[in-house]
Amino acid sequence: MLATIGYISNATEHLKKGDIENIVKDAILYNKKHGITGILYFANGKFLQFIEGDRAEIEALYQKLSKDSRHNDFVKFHDADISERAFGEWDMAIR
């Protein structure tokens, strides 16, 4: 079953620009392997992300992300089953 999760989080103080680029590179590889699509927005030290794919895959990714030391204060504000992807052509994009 397809599902989507949306969350916000705060970047930790030690996060640098190169870290953001690494996050995106890692996300593209991971997401392709696991059939996950989505979007990542980063501004003013805050992340906003939507991930979509198989329910088990995005739940596993969300748990992995919530343990990543590069950000904290996670708030999941969206969690729903979906009939189609909003970001079906995207492995991951950052804006």
Question: Model-predicted segments: where are they?
Answer:
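Charge-rich, low-complexity N-terminal segments
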Residues: 1-95
